[in-house]
């Protein structure tokens, strides 16, 4: 039995400045504190996250977040066993702010420093919340990423497929912007879609006619733009019903694509022969109600357990980073002062790059 470990986690990969303290005793884990300082108001006027503004805000807020996390946990630095920090992938300015703070704390205290892949934090969250056993199938679906992974260990992931262009969260945000809805786009589009007719617009279901688990959402976004422009040209603007129907049609298309691709991923995962087969979902888009409902139905039909973290742990947070740091530390992972911030960091380094990875390679 491994000894109890208490880790501080630091997260600053996008537009949430976060710190948390997690204690693990064997397979049991307890979140002693979790502080998240969002930046939505700072970026609202720009319709999206501005990297320079985000980086400056992280630099200003990280110290205070760490202080609050320790205070709420009732602990000091001397009570910790290690420091975990998101080292990528993400917006490099923010990631660098977090890494530099973590290095300073580790150097000043002598505590172990563990760099964590942000996506591993999401992917390992079901083990933090439910003690899920390896191997399990993970659908990581967020603002910047969308991929199916078989999680076999704290640092062992096999990618089955993913989005070759826009991630669903990015598509939700852009849809909200096109329709004049507030950011973040996911909750806004979901709320608007609740009163809409998903059958009014014949939006495409990209890549369902192709085998495999890869996805595409940029064409769906373009189809919505054309439908919006057609309505504006015809009527001179959008009614509330138009906006609701556009959101409902867009959301229904995303749900159908994710559900069908999940069925295919489960078929591949079945070959793992897991004693307790499970499908888990994580990432900000996992907070979407219709997506959760569809994935629950797919899992039930396949006879596998379905897990989704509490909504507060679906979006970016530092508790998942602290936990992933503990998992990696237990497996022998540890970093020194040479730890660097990485804008791109694929979880499955052996998988071929997705079509839309670009010349610099896959982000994740």
From Swiss-Prot:
A single GO molecular function term of this UniProt record: N(6)-L-threonylcarbamoyladenine synthase activity
Cofactor binding annotation: Binds 1 Fe(2+) ion per subunit.
Pfam family, one: TsaD
Alphabetical list of InterPro entries matching this protein: ATPase_NBD, Gcp-like_dom, KAE1/TsaD, TsaD
Protein's cellular compartments: Cytoplasm
Keyword Transferase included in the entry's annotation: yes
Entries under Gene3D superfamilies matching the protein: 3.30.420.40
Residues noted as binding Fe cation in the record, renumbered to the chain: 118, 122, 316
Essential cofactor(s): Fe(2+)
Keywords for the protein's UniProt record, in alphabetical order: Acyltransferase, Cytoplasm, Iron, Metal-binding, Transferase, tRNA processing
Binding site for substrate: 140-144, 173, 186, 288
Coiled-coil boundaries: none
EC primary class: transferase
EC numbers: 2.3.1.234
Main location: cytoplasm
GO BP terms: tRNA threonylcarbamoyladenosine modification
Catalytic reaction annotation: L-threonylcarbamoyladenylate + adenosine(37) in tRNA = N(6)-L-threonylcarbamoyladenosine(37) in tRNA + AMP + H(+)
PANTHER family, A to Z: TRNA N6-ADENOSINE THREONYLCARBAMOYLTRANSFERASE, TRNA N6-ADENOSINE THREONYLCARBAMOYLTRANSFERASE, MITOCHONDRIAL
Family affiliation: Belongs to the KAE1 / TsaD family.
Name of the molecule in the record: tRNA N6-adenosine threonylcarbamoyltransferase
Annotated gene: tsaD
């Amino acid at each position: 039995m491994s000894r109890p470990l208490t880790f501080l986690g630091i997260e600053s990969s996008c537009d949430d400045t976060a710190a948390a303290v997690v204690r693990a005793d064997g397979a049991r884990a307890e979140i002693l504190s979790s502080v998240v300082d969002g930046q939505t108001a700072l970026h609202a006027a720009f319709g999206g996250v501005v990297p320079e503004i985000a980086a400056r805000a992280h630099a200003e807020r990280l110290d205070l977040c760490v202080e609050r996390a320790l205070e709420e946990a009732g602990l000091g630095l001397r009570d910790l066993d290690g420091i975990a920090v998101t080292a990528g992938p993400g917006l490099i300015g923010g990631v660098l702010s977090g890494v530099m703070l973590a290095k300073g704390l580790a150097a000043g205290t002598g505590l172990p420093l563990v760099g964590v892949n942000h996506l591993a934090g999401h992917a390992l969250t079901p083990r933090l919340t439910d003690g899920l056993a390896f191997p399990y199938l993970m659908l990581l679906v967020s603002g910047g990423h969308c991929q199916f992974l078989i999680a076999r260990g704290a640092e062992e992931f096999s990618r089955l497929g993913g989005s070759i262009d826009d991630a669903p969260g990015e598509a939700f945000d852009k849809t909200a912007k096109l329709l004049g809805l507030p950011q973040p786009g996911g909750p806004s589009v979901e709320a608007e879609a609740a009163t809409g007719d998903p059958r009014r617009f014949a939006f495409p279901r990209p890549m369902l006619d192709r085998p495999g688990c890869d996805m595409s959402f940029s064409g769906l976004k373009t189809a919505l733009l054309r439908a919006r422009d057609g309505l504006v040209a015809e009527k001179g603007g959008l009614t509330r019903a138009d906006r609701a129907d556009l959101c409902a049609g867009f959301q229904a298309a995303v749900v159908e694509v994710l559900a069908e691709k999940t069925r295919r991923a489960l078929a591949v995962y079945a070959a793992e022969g897991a004693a307790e087969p499970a499908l888990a979902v994580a990432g900000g888009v996992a907070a979407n109600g219709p997506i959760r409902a569809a994935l629950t139905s797919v899992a039930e039909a396949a006879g596998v357990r379905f897990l989704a973290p509490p909504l507060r742990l679906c979006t970016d947070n530092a508790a998942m980073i602290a936990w992933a740091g503990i998992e990696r530390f237990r497996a022998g992972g540890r970093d020194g002062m040479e730890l660097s911030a990485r804008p791109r960091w694929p979880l499955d380094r052996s998988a071929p790059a997705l079509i839309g990875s670009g010349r610099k390679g896959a982000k994740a």
